[in-house]
Amino acid sequence: MNIDMNTDNKKTLREITEACITGNGDDVTNSRMCIIDAEFRRGFNMLEKHPKSITFFGSARLKKESKYYKPVRDLAEKVANLGYAVVTGGGHGLMGAANQGAYEAENGTSLGINIDLPMEQTLNEYLNDSIDFHHFF
């Protein structure tokens, strides 16, 4: 079973998982492939809306007081002002700095693609849009 991500792009992770398991019964491999496929297409559908984007990759544990926070925020703001969407994992630290810069830029777009991990990050408050994943690609 496949999920139509053209019509179901806003499904939650739980809804995707339940639909894939229900549609595949006891076939664990096909259920898992269905979930991975749906998550993958969901991510591409989101990024397709932003053909010009730059990813900032870095630690969620960087403190706002760090000497690196402001330069990352400033760079992301400049990138956003050039018309690029800023993409991060949606967490705090360096990701939050980049998202903040884009979010506060004039006409900036700040995106978070968050991996759902137990006892890990929460999304930062500087996102225009975000999606969650179970699987890390």
Briefly describe each language-model feature range.
Residues 2-10, 20-122:
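Glycine-rich beta-alpha loop segments
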Residues 118-137:
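Conserved phosphate- and dinucleotide-binding cores of soluble alpha/beta proteins
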